[in-house]
Regions:
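Short active-site neighborhood of thiol/selenol oxidoreductases, capturing the structured segment around
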Residues: 15-35, 40
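N-terminal "domain-start" segment that seeds a small globular fold
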Residues: 1-17
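Short, internal strand/loop/helix patches
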Residues: 68-96
Length: 140
């Protein structure tokens, strides 16, 4: 997987950025993605960065996943996985924060509560509520 400070491979969601964008790579049948994506939507709802889901599945399955897990942020399809390969993905979910200068400033894979809290903190967002029962880490 490409690292922090690396130049992000370019594809439409990261072209001509004026603000950071969080890329969230996923597969619909991944239990860790199913855990993570509602919290990513919460991050978006509470004033976090623009988020773009990058689906490794087809349009119909992706739409069903979004409806089932309450995901409303933009998604794009990675048919044949060229973008996933360019980012060096080994696991999903994999998350990359791409800055307007085209560099990756943060990344995470799986469900890592501390990573997500750190990311949310960049926007002054409290991501997890006291009632949330989430693991500290769940691999993808």
């Amino acid at each position: 997987m490409i690292g922090v400070r690396s130049e992000a491979p370019v594809f439409p969601p990261v072209e001509n950025l004026t603000a950071p964008v969080l890329l969230a790579f996923f597969k619909i049948n991944c239990p860790t993605c199913q855990l993570t994506f509602p919290y990513l939507q919460r991050l978006a709802d509470r004033g976090g960065p623009r988020i773009v889901g990058v689906s490794q599945d087809d349009a119909e399955d992706t739409a069903e996943f979004k409806a089932a897990f309450g995901v409303r942020f933009e998604t794009v399809l990675d048919t044949g996985y060229p973008v996933s390969r360019a980012y060096g993905l080994e696991y999903v979910p994999s998350l990359f924060l791409v800055e307007p200068d085209g560099r990756i400033s943060w990344r995470s894979e799986g469900f890592a509560k501390a990573d997500l809290e750190e990311l949310a903190g960049r926007w002054g967002v409290r991501l997890f509520d006291a009632a949330d029962r989430v693991p500290n880490y769940k691999p993808g």
